[in-house]
Amino acid sequence: MTSIKNRTSIRKYSTKEVSDELLNQLLEDAMRTPTMGNLQLYSIVITRSEEGKKALAPAHFNQPMVTGAPVVLTICADYRRTTLWAENRKGTPGYDNILSFMNAATDALLFTQTFTNLAEEAGLGTCFLGTTVYMPKMIIDTLKLPKLVMPVATLTIGWPAEHPALSDRLPLRSIIHHEHFEDYTPEKIDDFYAEKEALEENKEFVRINNVETLAQVFTDIRYTKKDCEAMSQGFLEALKQQGFI
């Protein structure tokens, strides 16, 4: 699969339609992804209408690709279908807990990545929206998600109208541990991040954000402690609302 080596997030799309036939084929093929106990603990809400995309946009900080993409997929951790099946077959389900959410979320995210690979191999562009877990209650309300269904990922999909450069990646040695975890020394951290910090585009991020280091762009500007704690609380409240805790 050559597309994975050249993949980039696509945020601008042409007006060319993504056919139901192609979308359904990709979704069906993605169902071959690994799944816990062969239960397929996920569901996908397809949004095509302008009205539907506009309703979802605020939950994703009004990023333009939400309304600009032909298709938006919201992938959900879904233990509701399995629970109702069990209840209707004399089973006694006990999936209103954090372990069950983790199992369903893992299934959903595996499906998301498999679908992404297949879609991009077919020539489509995609963008994974991490904002799904920032304000999940807005998505729950908009999509009318019932108990034991929790949004965990969003993909925008369409035919690319841009060809952005590849994003940088850390070297392979930064993620590999042999036989046991080897903790990170200051020297290793310097080595792992040297190339990233030396990129002109990242130096520009440091300059325009008026900070001293690239790390501060992330900790002080993009993903602050205050925001992470507030969104964590909102996520926990959404999990409780959806019956997982």
Region spans (language model):
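Acidic, surface-exposed loops and disordered segments
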Residues: 1-245
